[in-house]
Amino acid sequence: MSILPLVHAMANVRGDIEYLTEA
């Protein structure tokens, strides 16, 4: 079982949060 999909999802969520807090 690979954790890469989980890491990728977490990175996407973090990017969304940074984008929202920037606006």
Curated annotation (Swiss-Prot):
Superkingdom of origin organism: Bacteria
NAD listed as a keyword: yes
One GO term of the biological process aspect: tricarboxylic acid cycle
GO molecular function: L-malate dehydrogenase (NAD+) activity
Organism expressing this protein natively: Thermoleophilum album
The enzyme's E.C. designation: 1.1.1.37
Recorded family membership: Belongs to the LDH/MDH superfamily. MDH type 2 family.
Keywords from the named record: NAD, Oxidoreductase, Tricarboxylic acid cycle
Protein name: Malate dehydrogenase
Catalytic activity: (S)-malate + NAD(+) = oxaloacetate + NADH + H(+)
Known role: Catalyzes the reversible oxidation of malate to oxaloacetate.
UniProt KW Cell wall biogenesis/degradation keyword: no
